[in-house]
């Protein structure tokens, strides 16, 4: 796969990956407003949940217990609040379908097609983190469960993560 760097019309850097993937490092609201209606078949997003993660004091150590978190104050308060309604309006306008991770944190329409990511945390790890994550989808399908161990330092098959 060939990659190329280029400047966008927003004077931000983007990465082009063949055949048709472009990664943009810009404010998403600036970009969304440049898109036409239904430009994308699918939008997969993981917006800020509004839980203030930068202020949480603990994370998980290698043995599954809690460890003092590093100082992340330099990343700012990006996760202090959920996106404004304008974001949701633009996201729905520019994409035919959506998968929204953390959908349980947001005021979204009713959907049957949720995805449950079972992080396989099990009691043996003795941690206080969630057992899984929810993704809201626009698809009219039954709920689906995806099982993959991911709990801080405990992660399934990280030996060959590039090959996944």
Regions from the language model: what does each represent?
Residues 81-97:
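A short glycine-rich, Lys/Arg-flanked "PGG" loop and its adjoining helix->strand segment in the class I
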Residues 4, 83-84, 153, 164:
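General structural signal for secondary-structure boundaries
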Residues 23-26, 77-82, 163-164:
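Conserved phosphate-coordination/catalytic loops
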Residues 14-20, 65-77:
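Short, basic, glycine/proline-bearing loop/turn elements
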Residues 77-86, 117-121:
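Short acidic (Asp/Glu) patches
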Residues 1-42:
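SAM-dependent nucleic-acid methyltransferase catalytic core
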Residues 34-45, 49, 53-73, 92-164:
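Class I S-adenosyl-L-methionine
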């Amino acid at each position: 796969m060939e990659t190329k760097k280029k400047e966008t019309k927003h004077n931000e850097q983007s990465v082009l990956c063949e055949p048709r993937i472009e990664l943009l490092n810009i404010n998403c609201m600036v970009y969304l407003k440049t898109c036409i209606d239904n430009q994308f078949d699918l939008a997969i997003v993981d917006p800020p949940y509004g839980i203030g993660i930068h202020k949480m004091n603990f994370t998980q150590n290698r043995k599954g217990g809690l460890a003092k978190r590093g100082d992340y104050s330099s990343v700012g308060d990006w996760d202090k609040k959920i996106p404004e309604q304008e974001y949701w309006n633009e996201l729905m306008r520019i994409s035919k379908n959506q998968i929204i991770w953390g959908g349980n944190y947001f005021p979204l329409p009713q959907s049957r097609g949720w995805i449950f990511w079972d992080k396989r945390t099990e009691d043996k790890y003795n941690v206080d983190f969630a057992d899984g994550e929810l993704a809201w989808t626009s698809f009219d399908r039954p709920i689906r469960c995806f099982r993959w161990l991911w709990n801080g330092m405990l992660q399934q098959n990280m030996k060959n993560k590039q090959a996944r």
